[in-house]
Amino acid sequence: MTETEFLALVDQVLDSIESQADDWAAGLDVDIEATRSGNVLTLVFEDGTQVVVNVQAAMQELWVAARSGGFHYRYDGQHWNDTRGGPRLPDALSQICSEAAGVPVSVRL
C-alpha cells in the first residue's frame, strides 16, 4: 500500500471513531470529548481518562495509548491486527472505551 493510500485509509478510520464517539455522547449519554489534530485523535472521558489514536505513516500503523498500555495495529487488507497478537483494533477500542465510559460501547470499522 502506498503512503497516500494508507493516509486515506487511516483518515477514514479516525473519522469513523470520532463519529462513533459523538454518537455515544448523543445516544448513550456518555460524557466524552473527541478532538482531532491532524493524524491524532484524542478521546477524553468524564473521569479524565484519555485514549489517543495516532497514525504512524512511516510504519503504516495505528497506535493506541490508553491506561491499559500502548498498542500497535497494522492493516492486512481487511483488519487492523495488533502487532503483538492481541485483539483487533475495533475489539480493543470497544473494551478500552467501555471501561472508560462506564457503559458498553462498540467500535465498528
UniProtKB/Swiss-Prot annotation:
It comes from Bordetella pertussis (strain Tohama I / ATCC BAA-589 / NCTC 13251). InterPro entries: CyaY, Frataxin/CyaY, Frataxin/CyaY_sf, Frataxin_CS. The lineage of its organism: Bacteria, Pseudomonadati, Pseudomonadota, Betaproteobacteria, Burkholderiales. GO terms for biological process: iron-sulfur cluster assembly. It comes from the Bacteria. Belongs to the frataxin family. One of its GO terms (molecular function) is ferric iron binding. Involved in iron-sulfur (Fe-S) cluster assembly. May act as a regulator of Fe-S biogenesis. SUPFAM superfamilies: Frataxin/Nqo15-like. Keywords: Iron, Metal-binding. GO terms for cellular component: cytoplasm. This is Iron-sulfur cluster assembly protein CyaY. It holds the Pfam family Frataxin_Cyay.
